[in-house]
UniProtKB/Swiss-Prot annotation:
Recorded name of the encoding gene: psb30
Organism of this sequence: Pinus koraiensis
Membrane-protein topology: Single-pass membrane protein
Transmembrane segments annotated in the record for this chain: 5-25
Name recorded for this polypeptide: Photosystem II reaction center protein Psb30
Protein localization: Plastid, Chloroplast thylakoid membrane
Amino acid sequence: MDLEVIAQLTVLTLMVVSGPLVIVLSAIRKGNL
């Protein structure tokens, strides 16, 4: 595999994973407050 393909896949996975994580973290912060 090319480095460009690996980089694109890693960026896509980070975006997909970071989305729900941000929502969960914000929900936890609101719950704690």
